[in-house]
Amino acid sequence: MSWQISIGSILIAILTSTQACPEPASQPLTATQGDSRPAVDLELVIAVDVSYSMEPDDLAAQREGYAKAIVSQEFLRAVRAGPAGKIALTYFEWSSTSDQKIVVPWRQIDGPGAAEAVATEITNAPIRRGSRTSISSAIKFAASLFEQNPYSGPRRIIDVSGDGPNSNGDPVTSARDTALQQGLVITGLPVMTNATPAAPTDFQHIDHIDWYYEDCVIGGPGSFVVPITNRENFEEAIRTKLALEVAGLTPKQSPAPSTDKEPRVLCTIGEKLWQERWGAITPASNGPAMSKPAASSPSSKEDALLDKKIKGICRGC
């Protein structure tokens, strides 16, 4: 079940719940006994899809949404409400198995000044696009960033955004399960601004990317998704999602993720759709009936041979 409640009502709830919170402790806290790193309330990795399935307007709206969310009143109040009154954040963009680029390295946010600096880093970076969609590699890359974090917090969240299923690299459920075993939480921002395929070449379009994220991508205590259904909704949805993550809140209507239940959307649908387009296999189904493992993704050599062709004709890469 997707989250359909009013984003505005959630923002009001966040503001109300944090207004009565005490000021953060004046002395530095240590998140883990014996850990000498500066303490924060949350370690947050933001993983942003820049594959060719994302329209240029959506890429721009996504960038602007994160930059504005980080300096918003709701986000900063949620930050101040924590025991340490600060969080650590890093922001990277991803597409294929080998394409992850850090836009903002680990930064501490403890007030408007630090937030403005991070927002400026995001907006000043050139907008780019990449081929293929490897959510699994994005999750693995995000998990590795926590080991490089100069700050230490009791909660670690990977915030993944995207508009298509995994079609490259390891199965997304494998990467998800490994991250959950490491104590990480994965939340999702499925982008649904294109409700129908824009062209015959949009071969990786699926009707319910929100279901896919709920059943195949997110996981861990308090994980949730906030779908974006129109371009005008980017800023508000991202602001709400980040404030919820920092405050440690979960929408009441958000599904309780379970890695044991039968998914409503085949978790290997992206790999199957890719093979149908570039290889010869049996047509895929968008439902859970097809439970056989997907054929392996095209090799790196095949990827390279197809790359120019993909960039020219394919939105769903």
Regions found by a protein language model. Name each.
Residues 6-18:
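Bacterial N-terminal signal peptides
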Residues 20-45, 51-59, 152, 180:
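Acidic, polar low-complexity linker/tail segments
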Residues 38-103, 114-161, 188-201, 205-209, ...:
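Von Willebrand factor
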Residues 49-50, 142, 154-168, 175, ...:
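DG-centered beta-turn motif at the end of beta-strands
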Residues 79, 165-215:
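VWA/integrin I-like adhesion module and closely mimicked acidic/polar interface patches used
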Residues 191-252:
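Von Willebrand factor A/integrin I-like adhesion domains
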Residues 225-293, 297-298:
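C-terminal "exit" segments of structured domains
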